[in-house]
Amino acid sequence: MAPVSNQVGGHVAVLAFPFSTHAAPLLNIVCRLAAAAPSTLFSFFNTKQSNSSILAGNTSVLRYSNVSVCEVADGVPEGYVFVGKPQEDIELFMKAAPDNFRRCLEASVAESGREVSCLVTDAFFWFGVHMADDMGGVPWVPFWTAGPASLSAHVHTDLIRSTTSGGCHDEKETITVIAGMSKVRPQDLPEGIIFGNLESLFSRMLHQMGQMPPLATAVFINSFEELDPVITNDLKSKFKRFLNVGPLDLLEPPASAATTTPQTAAEAVAGDGCLSWLDEQKVASVVYVSFGSVTRPSPEELMALAEALEASRVPFLWSLRDNLKNRQLDEFLSKGKLNGMVVPWAPQPQVLAHGSVGAFVTHCGWNSVLESVAGGVPLICRPFFGDQKLNARMVEDVWKIGLRLEGGVFTKNGMLKSLDMLLSQDKGTKMKNKINTLKQFAKQAVEPKGSSARNFESLLEMTTTN
């Protein structure tokens, strides 16, 4: 992509949501935009803790002189004692976020001498539309970090609440009133739509957020149009612009801010070692296991998974965070009888793109699902929270590129059945064929004339030419 040369003095303010895995993909996109528009200043606002996490071991972002990484307060009052309430840290942050971001933006404008010309935010920041208006009506361009199905669910929250029973009367009830969601059941939806405490600050925030995308200059997402054409077309009809710009890991040039980076030297060594180990394995023979950076399966489920891997004798690569280990699991994994490799961290996009990997055991976070599609690797899904159950439903019943665990949790027998079905049966072969078709669509989408490449050009133009 040729750099944009006519951008002089533009200033794009980028507001990141500092929880879960929201901030890293947004910084990824900022670096791509910055590379293509070197005269535009990009100010990336995030909490100190989140910035430290996503920049640890990855200083390549610093090579962009037009990207300024800034800190915003986390909203926790001095001397505050956490009481253990669900989403307590998120609620504190969100209560203070509008004022904290405004103060940071004023300081950034004063320091740079450039007024903000475009506001890019995480889509969770529903107040972005008001901030953009207060800046003289600059474009507001929110980024949805999950998939199109979950965005559609939030946009249609009121319709869902008024037309479904929430599965209370019929467990097989599906959501037929929303385009592309006829296989989805109410119980698959993220908390805060029809389940959970709908009056909590977080649920009310999600509800407000779902009402704002039609007011945005554009909404962009890490996906590609060919994956969910029905949902994509429906959202296009409701938004001013809806831009699928992924999969980010396939876009050229390569991202300078990876969605996952090793946090320590030991993790970096482990990452290099597991790729060398994969080079020695047979094609499509390895089961890759990872639950991301946030999800915490129970000790009982982790033991059941380990026992199934041992009994199956299939080669496996398990990216297992140290904070998930316990004495029993550690002793089991140290017996030396397992036909695999356990590492504290793995370079997931590269692992899933490796020809020896034949299955992915995952929590079904959106980044993981999309990386699996880009690598052409079928999934075994054990979702936990957020959009993960919805993603798992799409994987199994809509795209037919994987399966959910029997009973919804890890058991030794259930996991063995899933491995056998995916690796040894005709159904698994069909899943592999379907995901390879999607993989080709994904590659075509990021080619120079592909849908995602064109959408990225549109995103670049609307964020840097004002």
Swiss-Prot record:
Highest expression detected in receptacles and achenes, with very low levels detected in runners, leaves, flowers, crowns and green receptacles. Optimum pH is 7-8 with pelargonidin and cyanidin as substrates. Induction: By de-achening. Down-regulated by synthetic auxin naphthaleneacetic acid (NAA). Optimum temperature is 30 degrees Celsius with pelargonidin and cyanidin as substrates. PROSITE patterns: UDPGT (PS00375). Pfam families: UDPGT. An anthocyanidin binds at H22, Q87, H154, G386. One of its GO terms (biological process) is anthocyanin-containing compound biosynthetic process. Its EC number is 2.4.1.115, 2.4.1.91. The active site is at H22, D122. Keywords: Glycosyltransferase, Transferase. The keyword Translocase does not apply. SUPFAM superfamilies: UDP-Glycosyltransferase/glycogen phosphorylase (SSF53756). It catalyses: an anthocyanidin + UDP-alpha-D-glucose + H(+) = an anthocyanidin 3-O-beta-D-glucoside + UDP; cyanidin + UDP-alpha-D-glucose = cyanidin 3-O-beta-D-glucoside + UDP + H(+); pelargonidin + UDP-alpha-D-glucose = pelargonidin 3-O-beta-D-glucoside + UDP; peonidin + UDP-alpha-D-glucose = peonidin 3-O-beta-D-glucoside + UDP. UDP-alpha-D-glucose binds at T145, A346, Q348, H363, W366, N367, S368, E371, D387, Q388. GO terms for molecular function: anthocyanidin 3-O-glucosyltransferase activity; flavonol 3-O-glucosyltransferase activity; quercetin 3-O-glucosyltransferase activity; quercetin 7-O-glucosyltransferase activity. Pathway: Pigment biosynthesis; anthocyanin biosynthesis. InterPro entries: UDP_glucos_trans, UDP_glycos_trans_CS. PANTHER family: GLUCOSYL/GLUCURONOSYL TRANSFERASES (PTHR11926), UDP-GLYCOSYLTRANSFERASE 74E1-RELATED (PTHR11926:SF1560). Belongs to the UDP-glycosyltransferase family. In the presence of other necessary color factors, this glycosylation reaction allows the accumulation of anthocyanin pigments. Uses UDP-Glc as a sugar donor, but not UDP-Gal or UDP-GlcUA. Anthocyanidins are the preferred substrates in vivo, but flavonols can also be glucosylated in vitro. This is Anthocyanidin 3-O-glucosyltransferase 1. It comes from Fragaria ananassa (Strawberry). The lineage of its organism: Eukaryota, Viridiplantae, Streptophyta, Embryophyta, Tracheophyta.
